[in-house]
Amino acid sequence: MAQKKGGGSTRNGRDSESKRLGVKVFGGEYINAGSIIIRQRGTRVHPGANVGIGKDHTLFALIDGQVEFGVKGALKKAQVSVLPRS
């Protein structure tokens, strides 16, 4: 006779793949046009001067230059800009 019960199956054991969100280029760094600055869900950080926004809210550089983070408006929303190289 069997001394153990049959091992049942589990309903766990799976997880979603990470989406690799976050800041890709930090303040003060130089960046080329078209390079991704931030990948995000929603507009946690808003685009400033010379920064474009993709349909998935990804922020990217429109020109070659230096990345600068700051705040804008009375509500102090986070913003990222690209300053042209001088």
Swiss-Prot record:
The keyword Plastid does not apply. GO terms for molecular function: structural constituent of ribosome. GO terms for cellular component: cytosolic large ribosomal subunit. It comes from the Bacteria. Keywords: Ribonucleoprotein, Ribosomal protein. Residues 1-20 are annotated as: Disordered. Belongs to the bacterial ribosomal protein bL27 family. NCBIfam families: L27. HAMAP family: Ribosomal_bL27 (MF_00539). This is Large ribosomal subunit protein bL27. It comes from Polynucleobacter necessarius subsp. necessarius (strain STIR1).
